[in-house]
Amino acid sequence: MIQFENVTKRFPGGQEALSELTLSVDKGEMVFVTGHSGAGKSTLLNLIALIERPTSGQVIVDGQNTRRVRRRKIPGYRRQIGMVFQDHKLLYDRPVSENVALPLIIAGVSPRDAGKRVRAALDQVGLLHKEKKNPETLSAGEQQRVGIARAIVTRPKLLIADEPTGNLDPELSLEVMRIFRRFNEVGVTLLIASHDIALIDKLGCRRIELDEGRLQEPQFEDDLVVHFEDDYLPQGDDDGWR
């Protein structure tokens, strides 16, 4: 699903955020990217989302070389990718449902179809009952779940997340990871940047570690897998958003 081939990203002034990085993420994997602040985690995700372009090397996403994606084609390219950020940037003058619908409105989806997909996405994150609420009335964890619903409402093949639990307490962080796990179980590929090693180790997923823009030895904590219960989430129809 994702391939980096000798990728270097150098910013003006000569700073190298990534240096000759080669890695791959298979379709259907849930993988974490870890490393110190400034290690290159966000840059790696930005290259996948075409927020940035590599200085050298190739980034291939679902068989498509990002170097060959022209500027006018970037919005269409990004529709295959759901993006979740630590700062979810919700619109506080609009209800939850309209926040989630925004990518569909931009894509020109009909109001009827958009409404169905918004409700399905909110159901998947356990917030269908709050679709008419203002985001300001929600807790920090609920606001992050609105951001996740917005990311998956376009039914992406790939979901990338940059420190999605950075502002949450341990309990809410685990709740968010449980949601990501459920999406992975229905075939979505996930790549998540996080500094929370203790939480990552509980999940038993492959870990890609960066150090000053370079790849370290791969990590896999198969002896620390935790089997999460999904009781807190409504068991919605997975096909509702896939």
Regions found by a protein language model. Give the residues of each.
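Helix-to-loop junction immediately C-terminal to a conserved catalytic motif
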Residues: 49
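Conserved ABC transporter NBD signature motif
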Residues: 57-65, 77
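Short coil-to-helix segment of the ABC ATPase nucleotide-binding domain corresponding to the Q-loop/switch region
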Residues: 94-101
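Conserved signature/switch motifs of ABC ATPase nucleotide-binding domains
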Residues: 133-136, 154, 186
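Conserved ABC ATPase signature
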Residues: 134-138, 142-144
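Catalytic Walker B motif of ABC-type/P-loop ATPase nucleotide-binding domains
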Residues: 159-162
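Helix N-cap at the start of a conserved alpha-helix in ABC-type nucleotide-binding domains
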Residues: 170-172
